[in-house]
Every structure is written in C-alpha cells, then in structure tokens.
Amino acid sequence: MSYVLIIGAKSDIAKEVAREYAKNGYNLYLASRQSEDLKDLANDIKIRSNVEVVLKEFDIAKFETHSDFYNSLEPKPLGVIVAAGYMAEQKECENDFTKTLNTINVNFTGAVSILNIISNDMEKNKNGFIVGISSVAGDRGRKANYIYGSSKAA
C-alpha cells in the first residue's frame, strides 16, 4: 500500500489523521522535530491497523534540509498532510523578532518550501495529493494573536 507523509505529526489533529489513514490501509511517514516522541503512537497504529509506520526527524523551519528530507523518503508518499504549527505569545513576538520570524517560518514559509519540492515531484509523476491543516485563527483574526493568525491565514 502507498505511504502518506504527515508533517507536524505531534499535533493532536495530525495524530487522529494518522490513525484514519492507517485504518484505510495507508503506510505512514510521521515527521516531527522530535520524532522519538511519536514511538507510542507509531506502535499503537502498527498494532491496530497492521501498516508500516516510519518515524522521521524533520524541522520545517530548516529550509536547507527540505530537499534531502524528501529525497530520503523511499518510496515517495502518495499524499502529504502538513499540520505543523507554532504559536508564541503575542507579546513575545512583539518584543523579540526571532519569535515572530519562527512563527512565520513554521506556519507559512516552511510549508511553502517543502510543498514546492513535493508538489513538483507529484506533478511530474501526475499523482498525489496534498492537505494543509491550518487554524481557525487564520480565518478569525484577533488582535490578541495577530502574528500567529496572519501566519496561519497566509
């Protein structure tokens, strides 16, 4: 069966998405900055769904690693779900631009970077699907977290 790559696999919604794809027979690549934290989930999915689950280290904010990361996936995934996200406190972002930049890089720029690589490959092969999971904060902007919200809306 085909593989589905889930980026940001530690989020609660990503974990449930992983379970659903596994129930439907898809093997999984679960990618996260701390993939070791996903061992219990991977073992549970393997037992319940009898599929392969491969844990992959991946930091969406490290753009220079994206090509090597995607090239390391064999076989290539049929589908990709991006659920990565980062939210610093609004005041932290206002007082420390590195927090703002990390928010934007994780929530928007990183997704664009990795998905450009993946979508080009899928287009070349005329096969595949991509799902982006964002946040209601991107739709319902609030002044209390406008940096996070705008990064999710982008």
Description of each model-found segment:
Residues G141-G149:
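Active-site loop-to-helix junction immediately N-terminal to the catalytic Tyr of the SDR YXXXK motif
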Residues I47-F63:
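Rossmann-fold cofactor-recognition segment
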